[in-house]
Amino acid sequence: MQEIESLHQSVLLQEVLQAFAPLEEGVLIDCTLGLGGHSKAILSQKPHLKLIGIDKDKFAQEIAKERLKAFEGRYNLLSGGFAKRFKEALEMHDKEIKGVLVDLGVSSLQLDDDSRGFNFHSHALDMRMDLESDLNAQKVINSYPVVALEKIFKDYGEIKEYKKIAHKIAERRAKKPFKDAKDLSDFLSSLSKNKKIHPATLVFQAVRIEVNSELEELKEFLQCARNLKEAILCVISFHSLEDALVKNAFKDYAKNCICDPSSFKCTCSNNHALGEILTKKPITPSPEEIKNNRRSRSAKMRVFQFKP
């Protein structure tokens, strides 16, 4: 456990604590509990706050449970996708919910575990957050039709040469299926000489998003979060696709006028805002945090305060 404490660094921890500083009591939902770093820090600072922690990775949840032992009786941990579980928690607790945290990053535990297939040197081709899920990266890479690969590389990886890469993968797998993440990473490296970013980065991102339905889950969550009252919502994203969804959702929440944009005159009374955006620009890690934890460098945090 001491090893986990030293290796796992919660991204933007002080900024998250500051975002939830106004909370004194009620329920905070950590939609992506992971190893429990953010939750542990929040519970330590807020003795009257209770926690609902959600994660689809049962192994990570066991570690989080051990780390939260000192707060026995103040938390409840749920397994499953965060959009579905959040909706259930909202229906059950409603006005008790005062804070919601979503950290969309892959945990260090998952990234560093070679059996999970998230890193370029992994001797597995998996990428599942939920190990009980049927779809994994090997099925996507070795079985998806070329047109489906093109779509996920274009939509989820924003890869310019999405057609070329999809066809090259199809040609190679016809001769010899990809056996693990390292095999795929090495193959992708042979196709590109890009020095700024590892050639496999965007393909791995696209496949991981597909395997875990990450963007669909985020969309579902953001739609459900509209029903929050007098709560602080804090979302940490790690790539432009996630951040765009969060940014646009927050803008939508803050709209006073809900008339058709083509209308010449407002007829809706112009008072429909669900609250206010507390971060006009996303909060990003300090140079010091990036130096201590390179994986934090792409993090962006946005915060919204819902009205009563």
From Swiss-Prot:
The keyword Methyltransferase applies. PANTHER family: 12S RRNA N4-METHYLCYTIDINE METHYLTRANSFERASE (PTHR11265:SF0), S-ADENOSYL-METHYLTRANSFERASE MRAW (PTHR11265). Its EC number is 2.1.1.199. It is found in: Cytoplasm. SUPFAM superfamilies: Putative methyltransferase TM0872, insert domain, S-adenosyl-L-methionine-dependent methyltransferases. Keywords: Cytoplasm, Methyltransferase, rRNA processing, S-adenosyl-L-methionine, Transferase. Coiled coil: none annotated. It comes from the Bacteria. Gene3D superfamilies: Putative methyltransferase TM0872, insert domain, Vaccinia Virus protein VP39. HAMAP family: 16SrRNA_methyltr_H (MF_01007). Belongs to the methyltransferase superfamily. RsmH family. This is Ribosomal RNA small subunit methyltransferase H. Pfam families: Methyltransf_5. The keyword Chaperone does not apply. It catalyses: cytidine(1402) in 16S rRNA + S-adenosyl-L-methionine = N(4)-methylcytidine(1402) in 16S rRNA + S-adenosyl-L-homocysteine + H(+). Specifically methylates the N4 position of cytidine in position 1402 (C1402) of 16S rRNA. GO terms for biological process: rRNA base methylation. InterPro entries: RsmH, SAM-dep_MeTrfase_MraW_recog, SAM-dependent_MTases_sf. One of its GO terms (molecular function) is rRNA (cytosine-N4-)-methyltransferase activity.
